[in-house]
């Protein structure tokens, strides 16, 4: 064929579809039957496509049709184009469907009870065809193994089987009651914590180190206090009562900080930060029941984050 002008934009996805069907069937007639078109219409699609590309896509004879070298190259790309069109169509169809069915959600114990459950209840009122099964755990549940549709997590490691969407910023706050600070003073440095009563959170029976951001780097600090508690809300209660210094999530102590029941300490070395994520198994299309719930939480927190400005 003659050298083409600069490549023209392909305006007809139907031409690409016709090309792929001819290539698959190695027949204009079979492709025409599959697409419910006439053989001449298929021929016009291929001619228009070849004109746009400036190459010959098929070798034709009275008995056979086969791809040219250029045709084989274009075929590889054309298959991907049609696959993406199918994906886009399916995704749009999914967005138009109302949430329905059983929804399994896994939540961190305190964050889930205080800040996620009110949003889940509102979601269920809006979508009466959804039934929710909700589990609470501060462990990182295996979502794929346990059939969980979506989990809310603070931080955590990436997993190739899962998709993570950031819902909100979050960080740890080191704090104590004004009464405690009046009696014992505030630590001026991280090392000074050793001279204070520290309230220690335990996970699976082990003390969890405190985490600080020092000159842009995370520093983990082992703490050893007389009170070791495996429940963050009970630890918060002890801090408010003046029993010592605690490091707790901003989501848990923001109200206490605003009300003056707790005061931050060691503000020059902020507690480490980790976003709150929605985490769900990697799927070709996200179901409406999961997508809408995640969108609802993200929208609510974008306008009214309960632990702002301590995030």
Question: Where are these predicted regions, by residue range?
Answer:
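Central regulatory/effector-binding core of bacterial HTH transcription factors
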Residues: 100-163
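Hydrophobic two-helix hairpin corresponding to the core of helix-turn-helix DNA-binding domains
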Residues: 16-19, 31, 68, 242
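Residues within the DNA-recognition helix of helix-turn-helix
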Residues: 38-41, 45-48, 119
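C-terminal regulatory
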Residues: 142-147, 157-276, 303-311
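Short helix-boundary/capping micro-motifs
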Residues: 21-36
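C-terminal effector-binding regulatory domain of bacterial HTH transcription factors
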Residues: 1-10, 76, 129, 250-259, ...
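Short helix-loop hinge/linker segments at domain boundaries
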Residues: 62-65, 72, 83-106, 307
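A short LG(V/I)-centered, amphipathic sequence patch enriched
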Residues: 50-67, 262
């Amino acid at each position: 064929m003659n050298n083409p002008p600069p490549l023209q934009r392909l305006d007809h996805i139907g031409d690409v579809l016709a090309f792929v069907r001819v290539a698959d069937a190695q027949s204009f007639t079979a492709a025409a039957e599959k697409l419910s078109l006439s053989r001449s219409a298929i021929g016009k699609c291929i001619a228009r496509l070849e004109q746009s590309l400036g190459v010959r896509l098929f070798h034709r004879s009275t008995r056979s049709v086969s791809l040219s070298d250029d045709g084989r190259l274009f075929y590889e790309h054309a298959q991907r184009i049609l696959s993406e069109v199918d994906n886009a169509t399916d995704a749009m169809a999914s967005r138009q469907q109302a949430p329905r069915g059983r929804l399994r959600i896994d939540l961190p114990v305190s964050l889930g009870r205080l800040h996620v459950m009110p949003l889940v209840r509102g979601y269920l009122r809006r979508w009466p065809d959804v039934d929710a099964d909700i589990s609470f755990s501060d462990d990182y549940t295996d979502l794929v193994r346990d059939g969980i549709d979506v989990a809310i997590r603070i931080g955590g490691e990436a997993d190739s089987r899962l998709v993570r969407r950031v819902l909100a910023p979050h960080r740890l706050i080191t704090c104590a009651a004004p009464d405690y600070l009046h009696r014992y003073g505030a630590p001026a440095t991280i090392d000074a914590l050793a001279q204070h009563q520290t309230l220690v959170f335990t996970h699976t029976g082990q003390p969890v180190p405190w985490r600080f951001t020092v000159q842009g780097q995370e520093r983990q600090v082992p703490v050893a206090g007389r009170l070791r508690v495996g429940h963050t809300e009970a630890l918060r209660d002890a801090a408010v009562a003046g029993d010592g210094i605690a490091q707790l999530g901003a989501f848990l102590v923001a109200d206490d900080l605003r009300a003056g029941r707790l005061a931050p300490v060691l503000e020059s070395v902020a507690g480490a930060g980790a976003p709150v994520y929605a985490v769900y198994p990697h799927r070709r299309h996200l179901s409406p029941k999961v997508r809408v719930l995640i969108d609802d939480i993200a929208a609510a927190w974008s306008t009214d984050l309960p632990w702002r400005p301590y995030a």
